[in-house]
From Swiss-Prot:
Subunit-level organization: Component of the RNA degradosome, which is a multiprotein complex involved in RNA processing and mRNA degradation.
GO MF: ATP binding; ATP hydrolysis activity; RNA binding; RNA helicase activity
Name of the protein in its database record: ATP-dependent RNA helicase RhlB
Record's keyword terms, sorted: ATP-binding, Cytoplasm, Helicase, Hydrolase, Nucleotide-binding, RNA-binding
Reaction it catalyzes: ATP + H2O = ADP + phosphate + H(+)
Binding-site positions, ATP: A53, Q54, T55, G56, T57, G58, K59, T60
Length: 421
């Protein structure tokens, strides 16, 4: 984490439980990010918090630190049963739930508190086996949580801490009824520590906070601009016929260490994957059609650096904490202005610099005015020389459902085709 992204406030300055401080320092977390510096004084005083901060600013560690401290500082309720977790962390996607669980593991190891993970798609019996042994902190998606609750595998009557992460995304995905169902099975809001974090604190998110929290304090960390000043933005206007060749030429020129390419449909993503895999790039595909185990494997390979490029729909645009993404390519300009911000927010995180390249083609250029109005500035336009685009490209691979992952990256130096402008 870049020092320029941190405040002067140290975790050790707070009256945090010593085991929590020890775990943080073991991970070399000494200074707070702005959202942590604002939220922790409130949660440590037992106040509910609804926090807004740009993605990549430390929201996850803010609520994990608060959760572990609270459970270590407060006894469990009397007669707590083995199927009653003490804290519940709700996330909108399986990938985000898995990432939160991974971020919580060092704290769990240091404190002895037990973690549970519950998400749909696969692993029902494996997840259930962990729950049956008893967990202190349960992290999951709403559908699987409700499933376990209806089967009496979990009981929410002993919940002391509740976290709702990416609350605006919960609304977007239609999970609000599930959230309310789960809240109704918990103790009253005044008997819990409640935390809500979101990229935006819209009216409907504030309404949810009013409804389910106990006089929540609102904390906001607003960037100077929605897209983050460390992200270099660039825009090209290709024709539909030149769009794929321009993307491949830009990848050869930029040769990104770790890039995410976003497209608006799964079929477009599959097409991009086919072109890049045929050209020898180490590329993975992440769409809703990819099986859950394979999704997690691809994300792990991308995070480890075994894959250099991830082609994704907006299922991956929110909540994923993938370090050191150097480039984001918007192959299609998104229909939703907020998705543009969330997409390019995959790079330039936690004080690092990043590069966002968008292609405004004939099909999606009409989305540009609304995007630029939303972010409050024009995206700098670059020109390219059509004659310099790559044209000696292999025939794209066609996706086989049994193996949508990757191909070996070509050895040797990248082609030297320069763009103009």
């Amino acid at each position: 984490m870049s020092k320029t992204h941190l405040t002067e406030q140290k975790f050790s300055d707070f009256a945090l439980h010593p085991q929590v401080v020890e775990a943080l320092e073991k991970k070399r977390f000494y200074n707070c990010t702005p959202i942590q510096a604002l939220a922790l004084p409130l949660t440590l005083a037992g106040r509910d918090v609804a926090g807004q901060a740009q993605t990549g600013t430390g929201k996850t560690m803010a609520f994990l630190t608060s959760t572990f401290h609270y459970l270590l500082s407060h006894p469990a309720i009397d007669d707590r049963k083995v199927n009653q977790p003490r804290a519940l962390i709700m996330a909108p996607t399986r990938e985000l739930a898995v990432q939160i669980h991974a971020d919580a593991e060092p704290l769990a190891q240091a404190t002895g508190l037990k973690l549970g993970l519950a998400y749909g798609g696969d692993g029902y019996d494996k997840q259930l086996k962990v729950l049956e042994s008893g967990v202190d902190i349960l992290i999951g998606t709403t559908g699987r949580l409700i499933d376990y609750a209806k089967q009496n595998h979990i009981n929410l009557g002993a919940i002391q801490v509740v976290v709702l992460d990416e609350a605006d995304r919960m609304y977007d995905l239609g999970f609000i009824k599930d959230i309310r169902w789960l809240f109704r099975r918990m103790p009253p809001a005044a008997q819990r520590l409640n935390m809500l974090f979101s990229a935006t604190l819209s009216y409907r998110v504030r309404e949810l906070a009013f409804e389910q929290m106990n006089n929540a304090e609102y904390v906001e960390v607003e960037p100077e601009q929605k897209t983050g000043h460390r992200i270099k933005e660039e825009l090209f206007y290709p024709s539909n016929e030149e769009k794929m060749r321009l993307l491949q030429t830009l990848i050869e020129e930029e040769w990104p260490d770790r890039a995410i390419i976003f497209a608006n449909t799964k079929h477009r993503c599959e097409d991009i994957w086919g072109h890049l895999a045929a050209d020898g790039h180490r590329v993975g595909l992440l769409t809703g059609d990819v099986a859950q185990k394979k999704r997690l494997r691809i994300l792990d390979e991308f995070t480890r650096g075994d894959l250099d490029i991830l082609v994704a729909t907006d299922v991956a645009a929110r909540g994923l904490h993938i370090p050191a993404v150097t480039h984001v390519f918007n192959y299609d300009l998104p229909d939703d202005c907020e998705d543009y911000v969330h997409r390019i927010g995959r790079t330039g995180r936690a004080g690092a610099s990043g590069h966002s390249i968008s292609l405004a083609c004939e099909e999606y250029a009409l989305n540009l005015p609304a995007i630029e109005s939303y972010i409050g500035h024009s995206i700098p336009v670059s020109k390219y020389n059509p004659e310099a685009l790559m044209n000696d490209l292999p025939k794209p691979l066609r996706l086989t459902r049994s193996r949508p992952g990757n191909g070996p990256r070509r050895a040797g130096a990248p082609r030297n085709r320069r763009r103009s402008g």
